[in-house]
Amino acid sequence: KVKDFSCLDQFFAMAFAQLTYRESLRDIEVNLRAQANRLYHMGFRCSTISRNTLANANATRPWQIYADFAQHLIAMARPLYAKEPLGIDLDAVVYAFDASTIDLCLSLHPWAPFRSTKAAIKLHTLLDLHGSIPSFIHITDGKTHEVNVLDDLVLEAGAFYLMDRGYLDFSRLYVIHQAQAFFVTRAKSNTQFRRRYSNPVDRSTTSVICDQTGVLTVFYSSKDYPAPLRRVAVKDETGKRIT
């Protein structure tokens, strides 16, 4: 019964399924029942695992319980890796922000619209590069553009946020600037930028082509981001210019 199946039992069952690559509720049930005499030592306090009980718990219990638990575990783990080297001479906190699309069956997941023939969700993750620990995880349907999730971030002053050009929204990037944080992203090919001055670069020892400070020149873009921007161009191993 669900009432005899605690949230901790549910967590252990789903963690077991994830770590051992179980493919269905029946698969979870069969494998855990095969280890019935070891369940107590694994942390379970229920006497047996039923796929119906697990299915009901997954369907009816609020997901916020496990979201809060995940945040608690993350808060415990982050200090353990805070001093882990990044491979660059930078003491600040560095985050990478990106989204992954996970395809789903449309008939089983009609609540996750994506295309006419299939469903999907997007997993938006802010990764602390000290230890590669996620500090923010947000799930949306597949149609949600990743740039919208920037509004949900709790920005940290002095931190660096690394993003691809899918997050190039100047009004939202200016919010990061106003929070006294920093962002690094790719410029789009049609970005209009006027150089004010250039910083010296050593092309003989680095792949940096230029390091410039300037402003946006398109009317609406300059209104969205009125502060100066830094633009750095580098050459990759194939000789391609990246800005």
Give names to the regions the model predicted.
Residues 1-27, 31, 60-61, 68-77, ...:
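Single, function-defining residue in the core of a domain
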Residues 35:
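Short edge-strand/loop segments of extracellular domains
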Residues 41-61:
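Major-groove recognition helix of helix-turn-helix-like DNA-binding domains
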